[in-house]
Structures are given as C-alpha cells and as structure tokens.
A protein has these predicted regions:
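Mid-domain alpha/beta scaffold segments of enzyme catalytic cores
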Residues: 1-164
Length: 164
C-alpha cells in the first residue's frame, strides 16, 4: 500500500517522525509520497527523501494556499526543479478557497501551468481542491482526454461531484 500524500517532513513531526515511519512500515505502507508546499518546505522534504531512499518519494509543486502576489517566483522554482531532477509527481497543486478568495485568478494560472508541466514531463498530479469544486473542474476542462492522471486530495465535494 502506498501513502499518496504525507507532509511528514513538516516541523510538527520532528520529535516522532522516525516512529511514525516505523509504524507506517509495520502496517504495510511500502512507499510514502511527499507533496511539496512551496519554496520553504522544499529543503525539509528533500532531506526526508534523502534519509529514507526507496521509501519516501518527493513530488514538486506549489500548494494553492501558497499562491500569492509573488506566485511567479514559486512557479519558477518548480520549473527549475523539474529540469534539475526526476520527481514522482507534480503536487500539491490545485485551488483552495476555504481561507481566502483573493488570489483565485493566480491560483487558476498556477494550477494550469503545473498541469501543463505534468503533461510535458508525463507525471501524475496531486490535486488539492477545497471549497473550489466548480472552479477546479472548470480549470481542468481543457485537459480532458489529454492523458492527465493523478489523485485528488482534500476533496470536499459530494458523490455526484466525485463522479464528474
């Protein structure tokens, strides 16, 4: 079994990270995917991947709540990283309107640019969608039947929305 989404590299796990990983192994988790949040999380995530090779695998992306006024700088880092090394996925990407709607246009731009890169690099995506189902589906519409693949995370929609 693969854990497709863990931010176990976050500071709040500093005191018991090794024990958490041991428990994950004991219950049959064979791999853990580490989705990136932004430029600040990247070093910690890469350190964890290096500490647990063949068990923890890093994904690169910019979380929608990290999209703000200077989002282009964050996206440039993602692009640079995609050119620098291999990644297991592009994520965590998407649209989140739970906390703030101020940067919705920028979230859509960032989401679609990262979707383009997923197709370019033939990588799956880790899509975060919270309180933004319609906006997310509209942003995904141009990518139907293009070979995009991946998982949804933080999905707050209902059954009918999931079927869509």
């Amino acid at each position: 079994m693969i854990d497709t989404h863990s931010h176990i590299y976050s500071e709040e796990f500093d005191t018991d990270r090794a024990e958490i990983i041991d428990r994950a192994r004991q219950v049959g988790i064979t791999h853990i995917v580490l989705p990136n949040v932004d430029s600040e999380s990247l070093p910690r995530m890469l350190d964890l991947e290096a500490a647990y090779p063949d068990y923890c695998f890093a994904a690169i992306g910019v979380h929608p709540t990290s999209i703000g006024e200077h989002f282009e700088t964050e996206l440039q880092l993602v692009r640079t990283e995609l050119e620098r090394r291999a990644w297991v996925a592009i994520g965590e990407i998407g649209i989140d309107l739970y906390w703030d709607k101020t940067y919705l246009p920028q979230q859509i731009i960032a989401f679609q640019r990262q979707l383009d890169w997923a197709l370019e690099y033939n990588l799956p995506v880790i899509i975060h969608v919270r309180d933004a189902f319609r906006e997310t589906m509209d942003a995904l519409a141009p990518y139907r039947n293009k070979g995009l693949r991946g998982v949804f995370h933080s999905f707050t929609g209902g059954i009918d929305e999931a079927r869509e």
